[in-house]
Amino acid sequence: HGAVLGGDISSFVLKRGYTATLSRNANGSGFSINYVAADGDLRIGALPANLNNQVRFIRIFPWRWVAKKGSCDVSPAALDAHWYYNWNITSQTANSDYEYVAIKQQRWWPSLNQDWQHLGIHHLLGYNEPDNPVEDAYTSLDGGRVSIAVAAWPELEGAGLRIGAPAVTDGGYNWIVDIIHQAEAAGRRVDYVPIHYYRSYWNKNDPAGAADQLYNFLKGIYDAAHKPIWLTEFNYGAYWTDNAHDPDVTQNRNAIDAMIHKLDDTPWLERYAIYSRVEWFRQTHYDGGGITPMGQMYKDHESPIGYQQILPGEGMHPSAQYAFCLLY
C-alpha cells in the first residue's frame, strides 16, 4: 500500500535495493517521479519544484536486479527467463527465480485495484498495441486515440509502480512519439517504452544485418522518447510479414542469437521477451514437444542486468532528510 503524507518533504535518502514513487496527489496520480536505488543509496537533496514540499503519496518496493532476458507466451521456466508477463494481472506471488510484470491490457481491463505488495509486482506495462485496429486497446481508446490514453493515464499512475508506455506495433512509431510528447505536456509519468517487433530481413543468411536493422529501429524510438526501451514481443518475422524472406529453423536461430547479443550490448535497452507462436520455424518449442534450435539457444543464453542506475543531481541538502526503507 502507498503511504499518504502531509507534503512536507524536500529531500530524502533512498537506501540501495529499493524503488520509490513520489506523487503530488494522495491517490498517486498527478505529477510524480519514480526513483530507483539499484547500485547505491540515492540521495536527493532537493526535489523538483513540482514536488518540493508537495508530496502526498509515496509507494516503496524492494528492487530486484533483473536480467534482460524474458518471456511472454512461453513459461519462463522453459526458457530460463528472468522475467515474464502474460497480458493480464493474475494472482502471481513473488518468485525468486523470475519477476512477474503486470499489464493494463486495455483501458477497461484488467483492474488496477490490486495488492501490489502481496503480488510482488513492481512494474506495469501500458496498453497493448493501441495502434492496432484488431486489438481491444485500440477499441477501448475510441480508435486508438492518443488523447484518450493520456486522459486515462492517472489510473496507471495511481498504482505507484514503474510505468511503461503503451506497447505499439513496429508500425507505431508516430503513435508512441505522439503519446510521449502529449504525456510530458500534461505532466504524466512514463518511465520506459515497450515496443513490439516482427520484421524480417532481406538476406536470411545475414544475422548481423537482421540485428543491425532491429537496433536501428529501436534507436530511432529511443532518440525520440529519451526513455529506456523494453522489447516486449519480438521474433524474426511473423506469419503476417514478408513471406518471401521466411527463415528456416537454423536461420531463425542465428538471427535471434545475433539480435539478443546486440540487445545485451545496448545500455538503454532494459528488457526483451521473445514471442514464440509465429509459425513453427520461429517457435521456441515444436508443437509435438521438444525445444527448437532457437529455443535452446535462447534458454542457454545469459543476459546482463537490464536497469542502469542514473544518479540525478543532488543539489544543496536542506536541513530535513528522510531515509526511506519499506512501507506497507
Model-derived features with residue positions:
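Compact beta-sheet-dominated domain cores in extracellular/mature segments
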Residues: 1-69, 73-80, 91-93, 293, ...
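N-terminal carbohydrate-binding/catalytic regions of secreted carbohydrate-active enzymes
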Residues: 66-124
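Alpha-helical scaffolding within the catalytic cores
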Residues: 84-92, 106-117, 147-151, 169-185, ...
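Aromatic-rich peripheral "rim/lid" segments of glycoside hydrolase catalytic domains that contact
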Residues: 97, 101, 241-242, 246-247, ...
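Active-site neighborhood of glycoside hydrolase catalytic domains
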Residues: 148-162, 224
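Catalytic-core region of carbohydrate-active enzymes that cleave or remodel glycosidic bonds
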Residues: 214-269
